[in-house]
Amino acid sequence: YFSYNDKIIKILEAEYLNADHHFTSGTVISDKLEIACGSGILRVKKLQQESKKALNIEEFLCGTNILKDTVLK
């Protein structure tokens, strides 16, 4: 999970990409919500915002804009 705009967002489904990068862990590196992690990239596929129903990434991004280069915690 991560926090964004003071809301907890659970990652329900994701794909790990074994790829080298130079980003800080937690950095959003694409507009498709790919997140840099220690030794690769996490491509989020399904998530659930606090007190909301689960959504696939396309549905989520229609209503929530998490900008590239945002560092998630």
Curated annotation (Swiss-Prot):
Catalytic function, reaction form: L-methionyl-tRNA(fMet) + (6R)-10-formyltetrahydrofolate = N-formyl-L-methionyl-tRNA(fMet) + (6S)-5,6,7,8-tetrahydrofolate + H(+)
Keyword Cell cycle: no
EC class name: transferase
Key words, A-Z: Protein biosynthesis, Transferase
Gene3D superfamilies: Formyl transferase, C-terminal domain (3.10.25.10)
Matches recorded under Pfam families: Formyl_trans_C (PF02911)
Physiological role: Attaches a formyl group to the free amino group of methionyl-tRNA(fMet). The formyl group appears to play a dual role in the initiator identity of N-formylmethionyl-tRNA by promoting its recognition by IF2 and preventing the misappropriation of this tRNA by the elongation apparatus.
Family: Belongs to the Fmt family.
Name of the molecule in the record: Methionyl-tRNA formyltransferase
Lineage summary: Bacteria, Pseudomonadati, Pseudomonadota, Alphaproteobacteria, Rickettsiales
